[in-house]
Curated annotation (Swiss-Prot):
<comment type="subunit">
    <text>Interacts with CALM1.</text>
</comment>
<feature type="compositionally biased region" description="Basic and acidic residues">
    <location>
        <begin position="283"/>
        <end position="297"/>
    </location>
</feature>
<protein>
    <recommendedName>
        <fullName>Golgi-associated RAB2 interactor protein 2</fullName>
    </recommendedName>
</protein>
<dbReference type="GO" id="GO:0030317">
    <property type="term" value="P:flagellated sperm motility"/>
</dbReference>
<comment type="similarity">
    <text>Belongs to the GARIN family.</text>
</comment>
<comment type="function">
    <text>Seems to play a role in sperm motility.</text>
</comment>
<keyword id="KW-0282">Flagellum</keyword>
<keyword id="KW-0966">Cell projection</keyword>
<dbReference type="InterPro" id="IPR022168">
    <property type="entry name" value="GARIL-like_Rab2B-bd"/>
</dbReference>
<feature type="compositionally biased region" description="Basic and acidic residues">
    <location>
        <begin position="334"/>
        <end position="346"/>
    </location>
</feature>
<feature type="region of interest" description="Disordered">
    <location>
        <begin position="275"/>
        <end position="346"/>
    </location>
</feature>
<dbReference type="GO" id="GO:0097225">
    <property type="term" value="C:sperm midpiece"/>
</dbReference>
<dbReference type="Pfam" id="PF12480">
    <property type="entry name" value="GARIL_Rab2_bd"/>
</dbReference>
<keyword id="KW-0969">Cilium</keyword>
<dbReference type="GO" id="GO:0005634">
    <property type="term" value="C:nucleus"/>
</dbReference>
Length: 346
């Protein structure tokens, strides 16, 4: 046309079902010149979405590849005198289209698909239109030398896939991962038995605890600071000094599995396959020996004081009894003397 020097649209059409007689062979109906009112437009393909190439130059066969990846092969069916001219026109058109595509790719690095959709209006391919004034069809002639072999390689254009509407392509950020805040979970289970004072100086139960802590790395420092503050503070009702408390803390066992720390304090231990577990009897004996060694001098001193107080009480009791016996004897003697003196006076 006068406005477009380079063709940009490819029209495909086929005969209407009623235009061909049943007795007429298919290749004869394709090579004859059909009237314009018997042609039906099946495809409206912009050449920007189609890749044309020469598949077989000897047999004058072309290849049409769509954007979807599906490929078709076209065989020229015309008279012998026009075959070379028509095929040379197709070859020139293919080279021209390839040059234009190369120029477009050099100008912009953006995908050619988005640029074409912004500048070209694509009509829906599902609409089937009857062309009443289709006068640009060349009149083919029957050639005796080439017969059914052309029909074998021809294609039914009604089987073309539909072209869907193409929207603009927007750039998406690559490798963008949303920042997820760290999840901090601290689970602590504590079981503590406090010792109480016994009046009869029996064995005092030691404070024991079992602590299971699941910590993240960022909370270890805060926990350590809290533990340092509580080192020199004794819980009420617990008869344990700072020395024994530090000894109990030294006996704690740590087992680290990646970011999880298991802390076991006191005499109780969990039966696991990861840490060697000491027998409960041995640990209890060691703790009892320590407490007995610390408390034996106190028990001895209290026992001596109790014996001295008892001896003092018995001595005071015996002395009081002797004084009372003497007073009773003195009273008896006085009564006897009075009784003896009364008859003499009478």
């Amino acid at each position: 046309s006068s406005t477009h020097k380079i063709p940009n649209v490819m029209l495909l059409a086929h005969l209407t079902p009623g235009s061909r007689k049943d007795t007429e062979p298919l290749f004869k109906s394709l090579l004859t010149s059909p009237p314009a009112e018997k042609l039906v437009l099946t495809r409206f393909l912009p050449l920007q979405f189609v890749t044309l190439s020469v598949h077989d130059a000897e047999n004058m066969r072309l290849k049409v590849k769509l954007v979807s990846g599906r490929a078709y092969y076209l065989q020229l069916c015309t008279s012998a005198c026009k075959q070379d001219t028509l095929f040379s026109q197709w070859v020139a058109l293919i080279s021209l289209l390839n040059q234009e595509k190369a120029k477009v790719s050099k100008v912009s690095e953006v995908s050619s698909l988005s640029g074409i959709t912004n500048s070209t209006d694509v009509t829906g391919s599902t609409d089937v239109m009857d062309i009443t004034a289709f006068t640009a069809i060349l009149t083919p002639y029957m050639y005796a030398g080439r017969g059914p072999e052309h029909v074998r390689d021809s294609i039914d254009f009604s089987e073309f896939t539909d072209i869907t509407d193409i929207t603009d392509v927007t750039d998406l950020p690559e490798n963008e991962v949303p920042e997820v805040p760290d999840i901090r979970i601290v689970t602590e289970v504590i079981e503590v038995r406090e010792a109480t004072e016994v009046t009869d100086h029996s064995d005092i139960t030691n404070c024991s605890g079992v602590t299971v802590v699941f910590e993240n790395n960022d909370l270890i420092r805060a926990k350590q600071e809290e533990k340092e503050k509580l080192k020199n503070i004794l819980k009420p009702g617990c008869l344990q000094d700072t020395k024994s408390k530090s000894e109990l803390k030294e006996s704690s066992k740590h087992v680290t599995i990646s970011n999880i720390t298991l802390t076991f304090e006191g005499k109780r231990y969990f039966q696991t396959t990861l840490t060697p577990v000491e027998s409960e009897a041995n640990t209890s004996k060691e703790m009892e020996n320590k407490t007995s060694e610390e408390k034996t001098p106190d028990f001895q001193s209290t026992a001596l004081e109790a014996e001295e107080s008892r001896s003092l009480r018995t001595e005071s009791n015996t002395s009081g009894n002797e004084c009372e016996e003497r007073k009773v004897k003195q009273k008896k003697t006085k009564l006897v003397e009075k009784h003896v003196r009364q008859p003499k006076d009478f």
